[in-house]
Structures are given as structure tokens and as C-alpha cells.
């Protein structure tokens, strides 16, 4: 008879667990200049779902959108940026991003193919004293829950260049990770968007989960 009482109790506890409000929120960066900051609308929701299921995170399933110059950016420990084209940060936006990053924030820039020539000079406005350096394959970001012994996975081929991961470091802390020639965000999108294979999408999601785990554990 006691077992019969335990069943409703277990169901109640499971219900309470599922009702726990999200403990953290991540954001997509909105910027000026004409580039498509909104390029991959299903990317972050899918990455969040994957992380909540596989890393036991409790991230709000609905990501926020934050302007580069908005002080609200300090509410988000992880900010994702993507696009194909032009990016412009004015002085106030560059200063806001700088303060955010130096205060402990993290920016993931994902080259959606074509972003490179625009984002590098703009990040120089944000952190003029820093240069992007390629992360070695031994860096912890490639060795979180999921192992990537050869660095970033190649999700979309484009012009055949190798995928590379670059970082900006401040006093030894990685505060910006730039995934180049890989298109991680495309791999996070709904399957029908790019018709990537399940294996390719899984590689992209696992690498994205590593980014989240690295940032949340630092």
C-alpha cells in the first residue's frame, strides 16, 4: 500500500522540478550596419534545448535579443553574435561591449560566412589592445563534456578553408570566442533549414554545448 502513496509523491516532485523557473538567460546580439544579425532564428532555441537536456542546465528556452549599446547586456552571461555582412559599433556601443566583456561577460561570434572582414575591425574598436589568437586544440573549450581533439567541427564547407577558433584574452581569461569557417549556428538550426545530416547537426550542437559549459563553469 505504501508504494501506492509513493507514486503520486514522485509525480509531484517531478512536476515541481519541471516548474522551477529558468535560472539564467542568454542573448542574441543585435547590431547596426546592415548585416543580418537575425540570420539563424532557430539556432539559440535549439542549442538551449540541447543544453538543458544534456548538460542539466536551466536556461530560459526563449533567448533574449539585446542591442550592442544596451546596458541590459550585463544580464546575460553568454551573448551570441552571427551574420554574413556589415557590422558597425559606434563609440557608445563599443564602450558598452568592452565594459560588459571586462566585467565577466562572454561573446561568441559565429561567422555565418562573410562576417570576417567586418567583425575584426569592429572588435578592434571594442578592445584595441587585443588581437584574435587561434586557440590550440588543447584548449579546454574543446574538452568539456564533448571531446573535439581536432578543434572546431566543419559544419558547412563554403570555400573549403579549415574551421578555426579564435579568442580574445584579457589577463588570461577568454572573453570572446570567434568560430570561423564552420557555421556552428547553421548546424544548430532546425533540420529542414539547411538539410544537414543528423550527424552534422549533432556535432554542431555538441560544440555549442561545450561553449555554454565552458562559460558557465569559468
Model-derived regions, located:
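Short alpha-beta junction capping motif
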Residues: 26, 78-117
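An acidic, glycine-rich "communication" segment
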Residues: 25, 30-34, 42-43, 116-192, ...
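Alpha-helical scaffolding within the catalytic cores
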Residues: 61-68, 85, 90-95, 160-164
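Sec-exported extracytoplasmic/periplasmic mature domains
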Residues: 52-56, 102-105, 124-128, 216-217
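Sec-dependent N-terminal signal peptides
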Residues: 4-14
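Aromatic-Pro/Gly-enriched surface loop or interdomain linker
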Residues: 18-78, 82-85, 175, 183-184, ...
Amino acid at each position: 500500500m505504501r508504494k501506492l502513496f509513493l507514486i503520486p509523491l514522485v509525480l509531484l516532485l517531478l512536476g515541481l522540478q519541471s516548474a522551477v523557473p529558468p535560472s539564467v538567460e542568454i542573448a542574441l546580439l543585435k547590431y547596426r550596419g546592415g548585416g543580418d544579425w537575425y540570420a539563424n532564428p532557430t539556432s539559440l532555441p535549439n542549442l538551449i534545448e540541447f543544453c538543458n537536456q544534456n548538460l542539466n542546465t536551466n536556461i530560459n528556452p526563449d533567448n533574449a535579443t539585446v542591442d550592442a549599446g544596451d546596458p541590459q547586456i550585463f544580464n546575460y552571461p553568454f551573448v551570441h553574435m552571427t551574420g554574413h555582412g556589415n557590422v558597425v559599433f559606434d563609440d557608445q556601443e563599443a564602450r558598452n561591449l568592452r565594459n560588459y566583456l571586462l566585467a565577466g561577460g562572454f561573446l561568441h561570434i559565429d561567422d555565418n560566412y562573410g562576417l570576417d572582414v567586418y567583425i575584426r575591425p569592429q572588435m578592434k574598436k571594442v578592445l584595441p589592445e587585443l588581437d584574435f589568437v587561434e586557440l590550440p586544440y588543447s584548449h579546454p573549450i574543446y574538452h568539456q563534456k564533448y571531446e573535439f581533439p581536432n578543434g572546431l567541427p566543419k559544419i558547412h564547407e563554403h570555400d573549403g578553408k579549415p574551421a578555426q577558433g579564435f579568442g580574445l584574452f584579457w589577463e588570461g581569461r577568454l572573453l570572446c570566442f570567434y568560430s570561423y569557417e564552420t557555421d556552428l549556428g547553421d548546424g544548430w538550426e532546425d533540420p529542414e533549414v539547411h538539410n544537414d545530416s543528423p550527424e552534422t547537426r549533432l556535432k554542431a550542437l555538441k560544440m555549442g554545448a561545450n561553449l555554454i559549459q565552458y562559460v558557465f563553469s569559468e
